Amino acid sequence: MSRVYNFSAGPAAIPEEVLFTVRDELLDWHGIGMSIAEVSHRGEEFIGVAEEAERDLRELLAVPESYHILFLQGGSRLQFAMVPMNLLANHKKAVYIDSGVWSNLAIREAKNYCDPHLATNAKELNYTGIPDQATWDMPNEAAYFYYVDNETVNGIEFPFIPDTHLTLVCDMSSNLLSRPFDVSRYGLIFACAQKNMGLAGLTIVIVHDDLLKRSPLPTTPSYLQYALHAKERSFINTPPTFAWYLAGLIFKWVKNQGGVAVLAERNQRKAAKLYKFIDKSNFFDNPINPTYRSRMNVIFRLADERLNSLFLKEATENGLANLKGHRLLGGMRASIYNAMTEEGVDALINFMGQFEKRHG
């Protein structure tokens, strides 16, 4: 069997060690004669899996006991609506940063429920960075302050936590578990699983208990209420059990790697060496302000875009898969989440160097 280096933005690469465990356990999980995918979500087997996954994630991120961790369905995009539905309360305004594609979609969704106030707009910089925080327009009152920590399409990542007195809400779909951060600075964090935590179909929400006391908008369906999910411990109905199980295996893998801090150092090395190569090249280019360059999603363009198809074809032939950029931006994108090895990044750099020699 020959596996390729998978640079997909999501669903993304899963650590091989985790895949081997899934393979070994798939038909007979822990000697019960069934797959974990077949057991009842309310049986002791899966309840144990679910509780252990939550404990491990809480430990990895140092999540205080004053926060609930929810394992939900619907993908992160559903959170674009659930956040205002549950957190607006009596407010008419919420603060957003437009930093790229995913924050822009969240803002558009929020307009169905409130007046989203833009603190700043990276469009002014052609989405190559974030305007200086000293220039942000911050109201004194609003229901919450929302931003996307890492924009997968635009290749922008926040190197800091925004300074605000408002309740901080963050979409960490593409970089949760990639570096340590202070959970207590946030009111709510959410992340879909298919970047750093396994399979599409699972979204993790970390929410402070105080926010669960806010009254949802009257039109909010009961199934979309955080408080009800918290009360039922994410078991209102059948959860995505296999995705939850796989996320738990990945949490174990992160612990075995040495924890989030160790992965953060590795992620920094991977990104730094790829950006260093691109910056030295006269053939490849990355337009993002170095301060805001994503460690997870490295976008780049070829000097001659007529060679794009050839680049992708030869990359695939060399075991480097899914490097095509997002349809909205074009170009190339190497997504180097936690599961991408340093060897994979080295292989990409070597291929890019050889391609430049032949076509530059």
Swiss-Prot record:
Recorded catalytic activity of this chain's protein: O-phospho-L-serine + 2-oxoglutarate = 3-phosphooxypyruvate + L-glutamate; 4-(phosphooxy)-L-threonine + 2-oxoglutarate = (R)-3-hydroxy-2-oxo-4-phosphooxybutanoate + L-glutamate
Molecular function as annotated in GO: O-phospho-L-serine:2-oxoglutarate aminotransferase activity; pyridoxal phosphate binding
Subcellular location: Cytoplasm
Binding locations of pyridoxal 5'-phosphate: W102, T152, D171, Q194, N237, T238
Binding site for L-glutamate: R42
Stored InterPro entries: Aminotrans_V_dom, Aminotrans_V_PyrdxlP_BS, Pser_aminoTfrase, PyrdxlP-dep_Trfase, PyrdxlP-dep_Trfase_major, PyrdxlP-dep_Trfase_small
Cofactor binding note of this UniProt entry: Binds 1 pyridoxal phosphate per subunit.
One GO biological process term: L-serine biosynthetic process
Tagged with keyword Cytoplasm: yes
The EC number(s) this enzyme carries: 2.6.1.52
Modified residues (N6-(pyridoxal phosphate)lysine): K195
Pfam families from the UniProt entry: Aminotran_5
A single cellular component GO annotation: cytoplasm
Main localization, broad class: cytoplasm
Pathway(s) it belongs to: Amino-acid biosynthesis; L-serine biosynthesis; L-serine from 3-phospho-D-glycerate: step 2/3; Cofactor biosynthesis; pyridoxine 5'-phosphate biosynthesis; pyridoxine 5'-phosphate from D-erythrose 4-phosphate: step 3/5
Cofactor section: pyridoxal 5'-phosphate
Domain of life: Bacteria
Keywords: Amino-acid biosynthesis, Aminotransferase, Cytoplasm, Pyridoxal phosphate, Pyridoxine biosynthesis, Serine biosynthesis, Transferase
HAMAP family referenced in this protein's UniProt entry, alphabetically: SerC_aminotrans_5
Family: Belongs to the class-V pyridoxal-phosphate-dependent aminotransferase family. SerC subfamily.
Subunit annotation: Homodimer.
Function: Catalyzes the reversible conversion of 3-phosphohydroxypyruvate to phosphoserine and of 3-hydroxy-2-oxo-4-phosphonooxybutanoate to phosphohydroxythreonine.
PANTHER family, per the entry: PHOSPHOSERINE AMINOTRANSFERASE
Record's protein name: Phosphoserine aminotransferase
Gene it is expressed from: serC
